From Swiss-Prot:
The gene is ttc39c. Residues 182-202 are annotated as: Disordered. This is Tetratricopeptide repeat protein 39C. InterPro entries: Iml2/TPR_39, TPR-like_helical_dom_sf. GO terms for biological process: cilium assembly; determination of heart left/right asymmetry; otolith morphogenesis. Keywords: Repeat, TPR repeat. Signal peptide: none annotated. TPR repeats lie at residues 311-344, 349-382, 481-514. Belongs to the TTC39 family.
Length: 579
């Protein structure tokens, strides 16, 4: 942890008046990622009136703190900080929204310098970034009016990103032409694009590259997030004018991560988040949960010297190890990250969550119980969900009376009625509270969440065999369909495709599930479809089952989650067999 008088902080502060704000902001973000959250916050706040960029840095740290805590006071503070930064960026005049092209023309007419062009571009990008973060804070409230407001804020931000991205690209092209042509084209480019203003100064390639990196972070993240919107919501998204090109998003984030902009380290984290969390969870590359790991490992190796003890980078190293089924190594990494984050409670909670999951994967139920119980008691995010995980792990370890007590707590901790995870936790806890509880039913609950969160592929063959053995001996009639779905998923992970197909077919025929609108049937259809897609002779049948899962069921748990996976699977067919 970087201390208050650490050499790293002293070095940054000594340079504060000697270097430009772009470099100071870049170093401030690096300080944050090297476990210096408090020091980074202090640095940005000390210089927040120094420039729009430093003001944005202070507001970003405030936003990050709010998103890690979900505390109302911190979210309000972040909103106030972001609006203050917006006002600072718009303070010179109201023309921040005006097109850059007109500004360049005016700049030429009035003899303004190229430095002012850069300043105006930077301000526009910052305003767009602030708009996005304000929209996110609005979405967190989970109210209809907040969604509508957030959507329109994002629309405004997207237009600004798109315009800035286009104009910076044009300026870069003008610079390249100027460099390659030392005669007539040089004068023409300078006149048309004002990339040099004589005595006023020139917009250099280096400055434009940093600006391109700055806009590419928001531009890329926008593309990536919109590309993951459930298909049935895409019409609404398209009405707002948002695109959703995943490849463009990844390319833009990769560009941003290599730039000298302050958001370069954040773009790196966004790429790691996508490759190790989003991609395997939503099955964005078919059923291969290891897709993207090579990219993630390359990023971690490249940044190891820059962030040797960063709790966040060590956390993502643990995610890679978990996805590679190196669970003991993953546990060690998460434990290291937990210790390095000793001063940052929220990062500790993320690490504890992963330790709990790795323990479930290893069927070390007592260790999982301890992690989730601590989260239930300390975290302000979804104590209801953590209570359910605590209960099933406690029951799976053999403490059935303790588990019953925790399941009773789930009802008291249920707060967010529109949250599908809390709804699921409440329903499952109520069911387990009312039946004659057994260790096997609790293990069924553990295997179920491992399946729903795409963690079964991370389990070793020996643990999968043990899960299979427990489920085979379960005879609870209300859980028959779920039992067959999970047995099919286990057999699929073990490579026993014939047995997997048989179990998925039994799950798809589950009458109890149909009457209770369970997710079992649509998920079983999806699983059957994915297995059949693997062979050319059954591809058509597989596609038909995917469409059946998509169109014949509605209103079940985790519907949006399945729709994203179905959309990805259907898209993979189009790539192989283009229409």
């Amino acid at each position: 942890m970087a201390g208050p008088d650490s050499p790293q902080q002293q070095q940054v502060e000594e340079k504060a008046e000697q270097i430009d704000d772009a470099e100071l902001a870049f170093q401030g973000i690096n300080m944050l990622l090297n476990n210096g959250f408090r020091e980074s916050d202090e640095l940005f706040r000390r210089y927040r009136t120094h420039s729009p960029l430093m003001s944005f840095g202070a507001s970003f740290v405030s936003f990050l703190n709010a998103m890690m805590t979900f505390e109302e006071e911190k979210m309000q503070m972040a909103s106030d900080d972001l609006r203050t930064t917006e006002k600072l960026c718009e303070s010179d005049n109201a023309g921040v929204i005006e097109t850059i092209r007109n500004k360049i023309k005016k700049s030429m007419d009035s003899g303004r310098s190229g430095v002012e062009i850069v300043d105006r571009l930077q301000r526009q990008i910052i305003v767009a970034d602030c708009q996005v973060y304000l929209a996110v804070l609005s979405f967190v409230k989970q109210e209809l009016s907040a969604y509508i407001k957030g959507g329109w804020i994002l629309r405004k931000a997207w237009k600004m990103y798109n315009k800035c991205y286009s104009d910076i690209s044009q300026l870069q092209e003008a610079c390249r032409r100027r460099s390659s042509d030392q005669q007539g084209a040089l004068a023409s480019d300078q006149a048309n694009h004002n990339t040099s203003t004589g005595s006023g100064g020139r917009v250099t390639d280096e400055v434009l590259d940093r600006l391109k990196g700055s806009v590419s972070f928001g531009y890329g993240l926008f593309h990536l997030c919109i590309s993951m919107v459930p298909p049935h919501l895409l019409k609404i998204v398209n009405l707002l004018g948002f695109p959703g090109d995943r490849h463009q998003g990844l390319a833009s984030l990769a560009y941003a991560s290599e730039s000298k902009d302050m958001k370069a380290p954040l773009a790196t984290l966004a790429l790691l988040w996508y490759h190790t969390v989003v991609q395997p969870f939503f099955a964005l590359d078919g059923s291969d949960s290891r897709a993207g790991l090579l990219e993630a490992k390359a990023i971690l190796q490249k940044k190891a010297m820059v962030y040797p003890n960063s709790s966040l980078f060590i956390f993502f190293k643990g995610r890679v190890q978990r996805l590679e089924c190196q669970i003991n190594s993953a546990l060690a990494s998460f434990q290291d990250a937990l210790e390095f984050a000793s001063d940052q409670r929220e990062i500790q909670h993320v690490c504890l969550y992963e330790i709990g999951w790795c323990s479930m994967i290893e069927m070390s139920f007592e260790d999982a119980f301890r992690s989730f119980e601590r989260l239930k008691n300390e975290s302000r995010w979804s104590q209801c969900y953590y209570a359910y995980l605590t209960g099933v792990c406690q029951g799976a370890s053999g403490d059935l009376e303790g588990a019953k007590g925790v399941f009773r707590d789930v009802q008291k901790l249920f707060k967010r009625k529109n949250n599908q995870i809390e709804q699921f936790a409440l329903k499952r806890a109520e069911k387990l509270r009312k039946v004659s509880l057994t260790r096997e039913l609790c293990i069924l609950g553990v295997v179920e969440v491992l399946y729903l969160w795409k963690a079964l592929p991370n389990c070793s063959s020996s643990k999968l065999q043990l899960m299979n053995q427990v489920l085979q001996g379960l005879d609870d009639q209300s859980s028959i369909g779920l039992k067959h779905l999970l047995l099919g998923a286990i057999q699929k992970c073990l490579g026993n495709i014939k047995d997997a197909l048989q179990s998925f077919q039994l799950a798809a025929q589950d009458e109890y599930g149909r009457l209770n609108n369970s997710y079992v049937q649509p998920y079983a259809c999806y699983e059957l479809g994915c297995v059949l897609l693997a062979k050319p002779e059954t591809l058509s049948k597989g596609r038909s089952l995917l469409l059946q899962a998509k169109e014949n069921y509605a209103g079940y748990d985790f519907e949006n989650r399945l729709h994203v996976r179905i959309h990805s699977a259907l898209a993979s067919i189009k790539e192989v067999v283009p229409h």
